[in-house]
Each structure stands twice: as C-alpha cells, then as structure tokens.
A protein has these predicted regions:
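Glycine-rich phosphate/adenosyl-contacting loop at the front of the ribokinase-like
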Residues: 1-58, 68
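Conserved N-terminal subdomain of the carbohydrate kinase-like
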Residues: 26-27, 35, 50-126
Length: 126
C-alpha cells in the first residue's frame, strides 16, 4: 500500500442511547453510554492504517485526556501524527444522541484545538 496523508480532526465521541432527546431544561434517563475515538479524518486515518497503509494525520490537539486518547488510537493503528498542540484550547469532543427505536442520531461537535488548523500546518508537514 502507498502513502496516505490526511488533514483532519480527532474528537472524542460521547455517545448516549435513549428513548428520546430531552427537552430543554429536562433530565431523562439514558439506556447506555460509550466514550471512544472519533472524528471523520481520524477514523479514515485509522482505517487506512489498519489496512497497512503508511498513514500520517495532520491535525491539532491539546495536551489533555482526549489528546492522549487520540495518540493512543493512532499508535494502535500505526498512524503517524503530525500534531501541533494548542495551549489555549482543548481536544475536540462530540455529543452523539442515538434514538433506541430508530437508530437515528443527533450530533453536536466542539472541535476545540482542531478549529485552529491552518495552511501553515500543511506547509510545515510537506
């Protein structure tokens, strides 16, 4: 397999399953919760790495628990990280609600440090 370079985002997915979304100001019980690695670019890098490609992901993280999750995820998939660390932000996260009955989802993403990705990040790694 060849070389793959991905400019993308890592977010920690927080996925909640429930019978419905709560209304504003309401608290309801959910049926399950999963915390794991996500982000479209990161997911593509991991898939390509697991298939044997020589993969590098260009992104930004923070030095926090979710940033550590990203690095561990990529290490386990043989993905090299071309990472710049943000000192004034956080590693991104996503809230994912999954409807138990239909499987439909609703997602809110807070990209954090990844929102600081710039053209210089590409130039610095080319």
């Amino acid at each position: 397999m060849g070389k793959v370079v991905i400019l993308g985002v890592f977010v920690a997915d927080t996925a909640y399953r429930g019978s419905r979304m709560p209304k504003m100001g309401e608290t309801i019980l959910g049926n399950s919760f999963v915390l794991g690695p996500g982000g479209k670019g990161s997911n593509q890098a991991v898939a390509a790495g697991k298939l044997g490609a020589d993969v590098t992901i260009i992104t930004r993280l923070a030095d926090d628990d979710f940033g550590k999750m990203a690095m561990e995820t990529w290490e386990n998939a043989n993905v090299k990280g071309a990472i710049k660390y943000s000192t004034n932000s956080y590693t991104g996260a996503a809230f994912i609600f999954i409807d138990d009955k239909t499987g439909d989802n609703a997602i809110i993403i807070a990209p954090g440090a990844a929102s600081e990705i710039s053209l210089n990040d590409i130039h610095d790694n080319s």
